[in-house]
């Protein structure tokens, strides 16, 4: 058997019969041989490696996304390198440079924080520069660019639907709890505001409540505002919604009889609290699946891949609402 044939088997070429492939793999297994991926990458001009970035791996949403991405990429024969960048622009830029230095085939960035503030171009310039070296895929964020692709939850429509449902149940003072002004958070706020306006309700600044996404911190901050009056809560994260439930418990407010609460992301928190939380499922699994499918298509030379895919959300109704 020639060296070229063995090389084709090791590198995953389809131009080898199954019988020959099995013979080579049997010898590799018997000898305990491990291919040098760096040498193989130089020969194939591909490391079969995807870089994945997120701001915080401890976040449940991020962890779920990473798990789904890694599993799906593995099925296509790709390995993954993970970088946790934090939220500062300098740290993000440094992680992008680090991953690109590993000769990754593509870069996946999870979370709205990578979309910048939507106003200043310099916030996302490093991503556009990175896309000149490798395809960039954003999950739940949006940047326009020739070699940049995005999969987004339809946060605007989900927020509009939640707010409208609360209004139909007679709610008039809907507190919007948020922790950032990322692309996703802005889409949710715009959906909330549009639903209020369409129903003829005023959009009140005192009902937009900004806090950290930390349960006890958010609860205590809400308690500190003595004149805060609301009959329902729509939170952009499940953790913030749980904070609202804890606020209600301290104040002796019954849920959902006196106060309706809706969270976001349908995380394990939504079924770990009492009462169980109505939450919007942003379908991160579907977003990741779409991202992987599109990445593979782009890397295979497909030029007709959509630069933006919108994934509809689902409201999972539980015990904190009566709609």
Language model features with spans:
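An alpha-beta-alpha
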Residues: 160-201, 206, 307-322
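Short beta-strand elements in bilobed, periplasmic/extracellular small-molecule ligand-binding domains
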Residues: 73-84, 176, 193-215
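Hydrophobic alpha-helical segments within soluble ligand-binding/sensing domains
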Residues: 147-176, 194, 214-224, 241, ...
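Alpha-helical recognition/docking segments in bacterial nutrient-uptake
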Residues: 45-164, 224-227
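Flexible loop/turn connectors
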Residues: 219-323
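Periplasmic-binding protein-like
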Residues: 104-113, 137, 175-177, 226-239, ...
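N-terminal helix-turn-helix DNA-binding module of bacterial transcription factors
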Residues: 1-48
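Helix N-cap/beta->alpha junction signal
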Residues: 155, 185, 237-238
